[in-house]
């Protein structure tokens, strides 16, 4: 670890292979906590590259719980969090809209870190059992079309690092890589990030991970979701090419809405919002979900255009299919899946 620390002190970038090896050392129980803290702070001060992010992602995925990865066509729409906007659970609500539209959603997530309610907190409030094994997750993806992967359970080697991150109380590379460490072999991905300057590096990492298609968005007001407030900056990965563009919600028929108007609350309050959206109630919450789910359906290749994605998202809700997916996941996740144990 000392050689990597010296490079970082000198402001030099690590190669992908160096970062991979450093990542394995970070997960080694014999390394000193002071070394872990120093590494994370120095890396943050220097600024992370796509190669460094990918190297660490390789190490974390290697040490994650093993999956059979026989499920084809899975997608995740997990964002980084960390924008501090205290919005309702946009991506988790959107996940059921995607599932209702026929996308297999492997939703990677955690409890609240910078918000009041994380995806795990919301799903528990709704009645979903978030404690699923890899074999149970495979079953849910195949038979329900959506499953939740509780990040701490998927990455047990990260327990000590989580403690150190909390003690440091400053953003580190781990604030960026959550969506990139999903242990399921995803084909497509929709990622919201809170740092605009990391749009391209994250897209490059998704390309290295072999995603067929992906879309990375930094919303107006630096939201880690697409926002109705104004211009959204996106990077699209398609046909192994990366294209940068901006998206104005007004172009797609939405009225502009300030981010403050889509704030959430505790798990009970956010569960109420999610159920209202999935039940077809018209609101700014629904419009926000339609924009994000529409972009995700486009990123998945389910539709050829963003406009078609938004229309399909609306149909998923208004037909009752999105809500049906939630109800099915509640039942299936709480069953004793003896057939896969």
From Swiss-Prot:
Keyword field: Amino-acid biosynthesis, Aromatic amino acid biosynthesis, Glycosyltransferase, Magnesium, Metal-binding, Transferase, Tryptophan biosynthesis
Enzyme nomenclature, EC number: 2.4.2.18
Enzyme class: transferase
Cofactors required: Mg(2+)
An annotated GO cellular component: cytosol
Pfam families: Glycos_trans_3N (PF02885), Glycos_transf_3 (PF00591)
Cofactor: binding comment: Binds 2 magnesium ions per monomer.
Pathway: Amino-acid biosynthesis; L-tryptophan biosynthesis; L-tryptophan from chorismate: step 2/5
Single GO biological process annotation from the record: L-tryptophan biosynthetic process
Catalytic activity field: N-(5-phospho-beta-D-ribosyl)anthranilate + diphosphate = 5-phospho-alpha-D-ribose 1-diphosphate + anthranilate
Residues noted as binding 5-phospho-alpha-D-ribose 1-diphosphate in the record, renumbered to the chain: 79, 82-83, 87, 89-92, 107-115, 119
Chain positions recorded as anthranilate 2 binding sites: 165
GO molecular function: anthranilate phosphoribosyltransferase activity; magnesium ion binding
Top-rank taxon, per record: Bacteria
InterPro entries hit by this protein: Anthranilate_Pribosyl_Tfrase, Glycosyl_Trfase_fam3, Glycosyl_Trfase_fam3_N_dom, Glycosyl_Trfase_fam3_N_dom_sf, Nuc_phospho_transferase
Residues involved in Mg(2+) 2 binding: 224-225
Binding site for anthranilate 1: 79, 110
Residues bound to Mg(2+) 1: 91, 225
Subunit text: Homodimer.
Described function: Catalyzes the transfer of the phosphoribosyl group of 5-phosphorylribose-1-pyrophosphate (PRPP) to anthranilate to yield N-(5'-phosphoribosyl)-anthranilate (PRA).
Family per similarity comment: Belongs to the anthranilate phosphoribosyltransferase family.
HAMAP family in alphabetical order: TrpD
Annotated protein name in UniProt: Anthranilate phosphoribosyltransferase
Organism: Bacillus cereus (strain ATCC 14579 / DSM 31 / CCUG 7414 / JCM 2152 / NBRC 15305 / NCIMB 9373 / NCTC 2599 / NRRL B-3711)
Lineage: Bacteria, Bacillati, Bacillota, Bacilli, Bacillales
Chain's gene name: trpD
